[in-house]
Amino acid sequence: EEFTYDAILSGGRTLFENVAWYRPKPLVARQNPWISPQAICLSDIRQDEIAPGVELGRKALQVLGLQTGMAHMEWYRSDKNGEAIFGEVGARAPGGRLSHGMNLSCDGDVFKLWAEAITSGETSQSMEKRYNAALIFKRATGPGRTITRIEGLERILAECGDNIPVVDLVSVGETRRDWTQVVTGDGWMVARHMDLGSTLGIANRLAQDVRILCDG
């Protein structure tokens, strides 16, 4: 399994932490154009499964000497022993709408918090994690270059709309995007819920049942 560790710091104090879970692994998603990749910002980062990654991320911040700013790291959990192995460590914000996912996981604003961390060291908002927020990135299918129809969305919104705060898809008539060059592909959606299982259930429906078609 592959994850992120993200943090905002001010004067050596950690103001906010996040762990996102990539579903499926990024390499698998890159090799299969029919997949709708997901990134889930988890509400509970104290879970035993991800604790080694959080611990190593905190140690990496100390080694880097990062006192103030935002950090984004990517790591995977070994299938053999559960060890956390880091593949990327950066003193930067994440891409791929992940910061927006963090916002939706706590009803806060990490962009504002980042600015406050640099300017004053104090936060004016609650950044308590309340929700699991799953980002789903869609890719059009079919032989054509132009979006001809979008299927399955209305039904899911009718049934689960309160737990789908973001729907930002291409419109019918637009040219499909090159998903190999754009992380968000032909648009993105968000499913969120306090319960992780419920979040994953809605996210899977958005990934599997919503289809963006280019009929040619």
Regions found by a protein language model. Give the residues of each.
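Peripheral (often C-terminal) accessory segments that flank ATP-dependent C-N-forming ligase machineries
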Residues: 115-216
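Active-site proximal loops enriched in glycine and acidic residues that flank catalytic Cys/His/Asp
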Residues: 75, 88-91, 140, 193
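ATP-dependent carboxylate/phosphate-activation module, predominantly the ATP-grasp catalytic core
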Residues: 2-66, 70, 77-80, 86, ...
